[in-house]
């Protein structure tokens, strides 16, 4: 399963671990993804989404109805 946020589209990034001796090895920076259930009052049901912590803040700010409308417009839900 892809580690992608449904709302923001955040994906893993690549970078380096850097030791004290300045040796570099490749690593991945993973997004902080959580499975969350949101109650949608207009539909009278729960919606389960895999979202990043930044997306949780967005949902708190604009509301789940606006976010779901955007997801449906993009064809992701």
Swiss-Prot record:
Q: In the UniProt record, does the keyword Transmembrane helix occur?
A: no
Give the UniProt keywords, A-Z: Ribonucleoprotein, Ribosomal protein
For biological process, the GO terms are: translation
Q: In the UniProt record, does the keyword Cytoplasm occur? A: no
The superkingdom of the source organism is: Bacteria
Which InterPro entries does the protein's record reference? Answer: Ribosomal_bL28, Ribosomal_bL28/bL31-like_sf, Ribosomal_bL28_bact-type, Ribosomal_bL28_sf
Q: Can you name a GO cellular component term?
A: cytosolic large ribosomal subunit
What GO molecular function annotations does the UniProt record carry, in alphabetical order? structural constituent of ribosome
- Region Disordered, residue ranges: 1-21
Q: Which SUPFAM superfamilies does the UniProt record give? A: L28p-like
Please state which protein family the record places this protein in: Belongs to the bacterial ribosomal protein bL28 family.
Q: HAMAP family per the record?
A: Ribosomal_bL28
Annotated protein name in UniProt: Large ribosomal subunit protein bL28
Organism this protein belongs to: Chromobacterium violaceum (strain ATCC 12472 / DSM 30191 / JCM 1249 / CCUG 213 / NBRC 12614 / NCIMB 9131 / NCTC 9757 / MK)
Task: Please spell out the taxonomic lineage of the organism that makes this protein.
Answer: Bacteria, Pseudomonadati, Pseudomonadota, Betaproteobacteria, Neisseriales
Name of the gene this protein is made from: rpmB
